[in-house]
Structures are given as C-alpha cells and as structure tokens.
Curated annotation (Swiss-Prot):
<dbReference type="InterPro" id="IPR006061">
    <property type="entry name" value="SBP_1_CS"/>
</dbReference>
<dbReference type="Pfam" id="PF01547">
    <property type="entry name" value="SBP_bac_1"/>
</dbReference>
<comment type="similarity">
    <text>Belongs to the bacterial solute-binding protein 1 family.</text>
</comment>
<keyword id="KW-0408">Iron</keyword>
<feature type="binding site">
    <location>
        <position position="31"/>
    </location>
    <ligand>
        <name>Fe cation</name>
    </ligand>
</feature>
<feature type="binding site">
    <location>
        <position position="217"/>
    </location>
    <ligand>
        <name>Fe cation</name>
    </ligand>
</feature>
<keyword id="KW-0406">Ion transport</keyword>
<feature type="binding site">
    <location>
        <position position="79"/>
    </location>
    <ligand>
        <name>Fe cation</name>
    </ligand>
</feature>
<dbReference type="InterPro" id="IPR026045">
    <property type="entry name" value="Ferric-bd"/>
</dbReference>
<dbReference type="GO" id="GO:0046872">
    <property type="term" value="F:metal ion binding"/>
</dbReference>
<protein>
    <recommendedName>
        <fullName>Major ferric iron-binding protein</fullName>
    </recommendedName>
</protein>
<dbReference type="InterPro" id="IPR006059">
    <property type="entry name" value="SBP"/>
</dbReference>
<keyword id="KW-0813">Transport</keyword>
<feature type="signal peptide">
    <location>
        <begin position="1"/>
        <end position="22"/>
    </location>
</feature>
<dbReference type="GO" id="GO:0006826">
    <property type="term" value="P:iron ion transport"/>
</dbReference>
<keyword id="KW-0732">Signal</keyword>
<feature type="binding site">
    <location>
        <position position="218"/>
    </location>
    <ligand>
        <name>Fe cation</name>
    </ligand>
</feature>
Length: 330
C-alpha cells in the first residue's frame, strides 16, 4: 500500500514539474482552409491548440504594427513576403532556428536577411487558357507579350492580388522599371480586370475571355472538384526564367509572443514533412520541403524554370504599388 502511495505521489510530482503547453494565436494571411488543415494536424501531433485570426496579410501586418508589444498574436502566417518584410523592417519578428529555415532551403527559395521568417510553400504564376479557342502554340513565350493589342479584350488579370504585385516586382528586377510600367499600361488598355483569381478563372471557363493571369492552385482546385475531363481550361507555365515567378508563402514568430517555444514549434512543423503534407493535401501549392510530394500531381519546382529573384522588400513593394497607380490600376 505504501509503495502504491509512493508511486502515486511521484507521478503527481512529475506531472506538476512538467510545464503545460500554451495555446497559440496565429494571425493568418494564408487561405483559411489550408491554414486550418495545418493547425489541426499540429494540434493532433503536439496537443497545442491553435486559434486562427484570418484576414488579408497586409491588414494583419498593419494590425501587428499598431498593437506592438501588446499583440496577442504568436505567429504571423502570410501569403505575401512584402507583409513579412514590413514587420521584419520594424524589428517585430523573432529570429528562427537554422534547423527550421534549412527544412525548406533550396535553389531559388527566398531566405530572410535576418533569418526571421521562412519560406513554406510555393505557388506559380500561370496563364489559364480556353482550350476551345487556343492551343499551347497560340500562347506567348513571355508574360509581357499579353499586354498588347493582339490580346485586346481576350486577356484577364487581377490587379488586387498580392501575387500580381510581386510579379510586378519580379518584372522590375528582371526587365527594368520601364518594361514593368509598359506591361501594366498595356494590360490596363487591352486586358480585362477581375476582382479575384477564381473569378478570372471562371471567366475563361465560361468563354468570356480567352486567357487570364492567375495562380496555379485555383485551377487545380477547380479541376479536382469538377473533374479534369469536364473543364474547358488548362494551364500554361511560361517557364524559361520569365517573370512568371514562383511566389512563396511564409511564416514568422513575433517578438511580442508570450509563447515563443510553442510558436517556434508551429513554424518548424509548417516547414517539416508532416506540416508540408497537411498543407499540400488540401491546396495545390508546391511543397518546399524536398521530402514531400504534392497530392495534386504538380510538376517539380525545378521544371517550372522560375526566375531567380530575391525576396521582395518593403521599398520594392511600395515601388510596385506606385507603378500600379501610374498605370491607372489603383
């Protein structure tokens, strides 16, 4: 009896000595479905609960700056590198362990200068086209060539998309400011703007326009839902280092976090094999961890022949926004 009591007391002491894991709050600028899938997988693996506060990345970055040290957020998960760059420049992000950053480090994958955010998954800028009107041979070799009279009222674009803004940055870096502004003015004059990538995709599917500049995963989700054999559209990857660039989603831990250990575990989980599998099982994003393969049968990133561009900075984002204004798109 005394032995049983002794063991019970020992177990109680060990339990008391083990600190409870804190729940974490994630300010989420990623698509909610994908973020929720990863959060649920993380909770199952660790027991740490995750509260998602979802909104646009820029909006959340502004909120974090305003909240400062009082922010309840532990992690910022953004689809836009410029939003992360804004917080990094304000010294609001906590450096991440090299082991986390190295999980997704590879050729062409942007790396934070201060090592305070990590690239997690990729999306490719693509041209979705109507197969009833066009074949691959009818498509342009460069995304810049869609902003021409040949494509008047035939090409769609989404000027409010964060990925579109980063594509402008890529064009400036690779081709120069004049080329970027010419491209924007051409799209403004000859193209048709849409409020969302999904709306632009549907416009091509419905035959309203011949093609549109979108992100790859919108089409993959649509094709999976409808059945590839039942849709009229396909994707064209521009390739050969054209500014149809790979864009990354990223995650970061905030310096103001009261639960840094748990927050860093979450970001490490996102970059690791289990988190990457959970994310890419529900969205057609490119896993950046080399040990994970997408369930959407995506081409390997290397075959996309994406251009090598550095991570977008705050000043580059602001410059791209000014070009949008000059072109009359804002």
């Amino acid at each position: 009896m005394k032995t049983s009591i002794r063991y019970a007391l020992l177990a109680a002491a060990l339990t008391a000595a083990t600190p409870a894991l804190a729940d974490i709050t994630v300010y989420n600028g990623q698509h909610k479905e994908a973020a929720q899938a990863v959060a649920d997988a993380f909770t199952r693996a660790t027991g740490i609960k995750v509260k998602l506060n979802s909104a646009k990345g820029d909006q959340l970055a502004g909120q974090i700056k305003e909240e400062g040290s009082r922010s309840p957020a532990d992690v910022f998960y953004s689809e836009q590198i410029p939003a992360l760059a804004t917080l990094s420049a304000a010294n609001l992000l906590e450096p991440l362990p090299a082991s986390t950053i190295n999980e997704t480090r590879g050729k062409g994958v942007p790396v934070a200068a201060k090592k305070d955010w990590v690239a997690l998954s990729g999306r490719s800028r693509v041209v979705v086209y109507d197969t009833r009107k066009l074949s691959e041979k009818d498509l342009e070799k460069s995304v810049l060539n869609y902003a021409t009279p040949k494509w008047k009222n035939r090409i769609g674009y989404v000027p409010t998309s964060g990925a579109f803004l980063e594509q402008i940055v890529a064009i400036v870096k690779l081709k120069g400011e004049a080329a970027a502004l010419k491209w924007l003015k051409g799209l403004k004059e000859y193209g048709k703007p849409y409020a969302k990538n999904s709306v632009a995709l549907q416009a091509v599917e419905n035959g309203e326009i011949d093609a549109a500049l979108i992100n790859n995963y919108y089409w993959h989700a649509f094709a999976r839902e409808k059945g590839v054999q039942n849709v009229h559209t396909r994707l064209n990857f521009v390739r050969h280092r054209d500014p149809g660039a790979l864009v990354t989603y990223s995650g970061a831990v905030l310096k103001s976090s009261q639960n840094k250990d748990e927050a860093k575990k979450f970001v490490a989980f996102l970059a690791g094999k289990e988190g990457q599998r959970a994310l890419t099982a529900v969205r057609a994003e490119y896993p950046l961890n080399p040990h994970v393969v997408s369930t959407f049968n995506l081409e390997p990133i290397a075959k996309l022949e994406a251009p090598q561009v550095s991570a977008t900075t705050v000043s580059e984002k602001e410059h791209a926004t000014r070009l949008l204004e000059q072109a009359g798109m804002k």
